[in-house]
Structure formats: structure tokens, C-alpha cells
């Protein structure tokens, strides 16, 4: 399977020096390693054997419509996306998730199966007087100073977390993946991206001409029947 990852120049230097690339702890923003990331790592460990000392994975693109990764677009470059690496990986070596459904994890929202399921969750929030901002605060402690932790709230969060497994699927036109390690002999091409050329590489969350970013959760809701 051919996939693509975007990395920093220092990551490329590490790759060339060592003959492989892993995610060193010092490059991880610990403040952002909340319940969502912990869930991802725990589930990845169940499906992909970790033969390295790495605690955190390397992210990559698996599918974006008819391509592997998003096409370049005019806009501000994602910080740290200096190098585009195309490499081959076995299916047993990669943890694949649906990009849209994963957006629910970042906001700590329930992933519904259909419209009825969605409405049921909305009623649950209303009955328990829980706001979506409170749910997000629970997983984004880097952006919120405090969060709820009462029994009623945590019970709903537990229901939400049980739905997260729905993002572990290849049934989507936009797929992302995580690997523990990239060996140099897996690499097909390495492309140094031009600096300040006015393009966004490897991202779907850039601002559009209207100044807004795509709402992936809203898009998923529209797909429900």
C-alpha cells in the first residue's frame, strides 16, 4: 500500500542519519495528548504491533478521493510540512481511520449510525444539560482551562467514547493512517517542498475563499439517512 506523510526537515535529517523514522517524544505537544490521542494509541496498539520504542505514531495520508493525499491549494503553509515522503507499507503495519469520523473524536462527539441515532444523542445532551462546548473541553485541555467531571457528564462521555470505534474503517473517500516506523527502504520518493511558494500541502483544513474551513462533522451529518 502506497501512502504519504508530510514531515519537517529535521525529521528528514533523522531519517537519513538513522535509516528509519519514528516519532520521538520531544516532538510531541504533550498538552494536546488528551483522552482522544490516548484512545487512538490504545486502539492502534491492539491492531498494529509496535516493534519500536516509540510511544506516539507517525501520521500519513492513505486516500483522498482519487488520490492519496489532498492536492495543493493556495494558502498559508502548514507549519512543519517541509517534506513530502511517499512510502510503501503493509496493511498489517498501518492503523487506518476515516478522516470525517475522526473529527468527532477531536470534539468529543458521538458518531451516529443514522439520523435517528443522531437525534437520540442530541436528546441525551439536552436531558443531561450538557453542551457541546463542555464535551470539547473534556478532550482539549490545551484550549480550555477547566472541564466538567461530574458523574452524569462522565457517563455521557463514556457513551460517546464507545462510538469512536466507528472511525476505524476503510469505508470512506478520505482516509488517514498511523504507523510506528518508516524504514528508509520503504520509501519511494522524497520531495522537498518549495518554501513560501504560496501553497498549502497535505491539508484539508485550510481556509477557503470565503474565509471558512470545511465543517467535517456537518458534512458527515448530511450523509446520514
Name the predicted role of every residue range:
Residues 1-2, 26-28, 157:
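Residue-level marker of intrinsically disordered, low-complexity segments enriched
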Residues 4-7, 32-36, 127, 152, ...:
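Non-membrane alpha-helical secondary structure
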Residues 22, 26-29, 34-129:
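ADP-ribosyltransferase catalytic core
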Residues 86-225:
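Active-site and NAD+-binding cores of ADP-ribose-processing enzymes
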Residues 1-22:
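Short, extreme N-terminal segment that most often corresponds to the first beta-strand
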Amino acid at each position: 500500500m502506497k501512502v504519504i506523510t508530510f514531515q519537517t526537515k529535521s525529521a528528514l535529517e533523522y531519517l537519513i542519519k538513522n535509516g528509519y523514522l519514528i516519532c520521538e517524544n520531544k516532538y510531541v505537544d504533550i498538552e494536546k495528548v488528551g483522552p482522544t490521542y490516548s484512545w487512538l494509541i490504545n486502539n492502534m496498539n491492539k491492531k498494529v504491533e509496535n516493534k519500536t520504542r516509540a510511544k506516539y505514531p507517525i501520521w500519513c495520508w492513505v486516500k483522498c478521493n482519487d488520490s492519496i493525499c489532498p492536492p495543493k491549494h493556495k494558502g498559508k503553509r502548514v507549519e512543519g510540512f517541509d517534506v513530502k515522503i511517499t512510502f510503501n507499507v503493509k496493511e498489517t503495519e498501518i492503523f487506518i481511520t476515516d478522516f470525517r469520523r475522526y473529527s468527532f473524536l477531536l470534539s468529543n462527539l458521538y458518531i451516529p449510525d443514522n439520523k435517528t441515532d443522531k437525534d437520540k444523542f442530541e436528546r441525551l445532551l439536552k436531558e443531561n444539560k450538557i453542551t457541546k462546548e463542555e464535551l470539547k473541553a473534556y478532550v482539549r485541555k490545551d484550549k480550555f482551562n477547566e472541564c466538567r467531571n461530574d458523574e452524569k457528564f462522565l457517563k455521557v462521555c463514556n457513551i460517546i467514547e464507545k462510538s469512536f470505534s466507528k472511525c476505524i474503517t476503510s469505508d470512506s473517500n478520505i482516509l488517514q493512517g498511523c504507523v510506528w516506523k518508516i524504514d528508509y527502504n520503504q520509501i519511494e520518493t522524497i520531495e522537498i517542498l518549495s518554501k513560501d511558494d504560496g501553497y498549502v500541502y497535505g491539508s484539508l483544513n485550510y481556509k477557503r475563499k470565503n474565509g471558512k474551513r470545511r465543517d467535517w462533522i456537518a458534512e458527515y451529518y448530511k450523509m446520514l439517512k
